[in-house]
Amino acid sequence: MNKKNTIYNSDTIVALATASGMGAIAVIRLSGANAIEIADQIFKSYSKKSLIDAPSHTVHLGTLEAKNQVIDECLATIFKGTKSYTGEPVVEFSCHGSNYIVEEVIKLCLANGARLAEAGEFTKRAFLNGKLALNQAEAVADLIASDSKASHQVALQQMRGGFTSEIEALRQELLNFASLIELELDFSEEDVEFADRSQFKNLLKTIKTTLSSLIQSFSVGNVLKNGIPVAIVGKPNAGKSTLLNALLNEERAIVSDIAGTTRDTIEETLHIGGIAFRFIDTAGIRDTQDQIEAIGVQKAKEKIEKASVILFLFDDKDNTVSEITTFVKENYREGAKYVLLHNKTDLSPEETTAFDDEILQSLKGYTDTLLRISAKEGQNITELKNFLADYAQTLSHIGKATVVTNIRHYEALSNALQAIEKVEEGMQMHLSGDLLAIDIRETLYHLGTITGEVSNEEVLGNIFSRFCIGK
């Protein structure tokens, strides 16, 4: 990324950087051209030294005072010049985590020339001052919101610039060729080519492959970020709610021998192997005249459409091989993983394994996974969890490959791919350099919107408004 010139904003902002509410420590952050001067007016160091004269990246013990009245004893950490998160002078007060203290310190900063920070304004300044690319800034929000090992690793990799460097490398190579083609336009009367066309074709092929790979990774990245949706489906009274309770190890769903008890979907998140799974207990699927139950059945079918994994419960008493195979084939969706769960096997003789073999043979090409469980007795629930964890690991080599998790990035990559395909078509049609340059510039534009090389205030406002105030 081309570093932008450091922007010392005319105003200095302040906000609580840690979570709100009572706690042991609260960090209050000042950032802006006058941050250190404002801090020096309200902070009295026990060393008697002025913060203005202190070196950058130093910590000072002292008191925060208003009209000679001590508000709190705290630590003041100072960052001078551009050597801070925001790329401008920053002071962070580590105070005791009283709501009253936090309120008084912020009021004191406001009274001495600061203003309240807007949502995400610290990170926005980091972007504007060239400390972060735009997609890295978005990854900061994802990192804060991450609730599993997988989502944490993906966000961390992007925040540290993995995705940024990949996009910038593509953009730079394309920019180099664009410059040569633009140069050709200046010598159009001399009919010379500065850009090697065969080399350019190879570059286009590389860019297309990379863009396609990144676009395809979004389906994986989205579930890693938001949790893998797992629909628990089957006939009424198949044991779906019992399975959800067994997976969670708590009584989350109502369990009853009365068929049709579950009328609506119940969703709970469980972390298995560092990955979030969103288990969805659905209404039993059957033909019914009950209007409310029918709505539940429709919702169940909608969840199947959106799920990455479908756990289909059955038992050998209430289901035939034909019924099971028909259900899977009618609800089959390319890309989803279907897992057959032969439930209530504590009540079934071992001979029913032939029943299972017949099902798998009938569903060859649709699924090859069948587990025998007893949700009520907890049999093979651990094996089911292990299977799901192993399946999730096959989705992506987390932490190794770049995974797209942001819909904005996905759309920009898709637009860039369309533009680069137009360049490729133009090459095949032997179009002139000026026409090729139009589509090349469009590709560069879309790639630039990802890292923030190309941006506008409306887009920035939308992105940073999703942040918490102190970040």
Identify the role of each PLM range:
Residues R115, A276-R278, T369:
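Conserved beta-strand segments of alpha/beta enzyme cores
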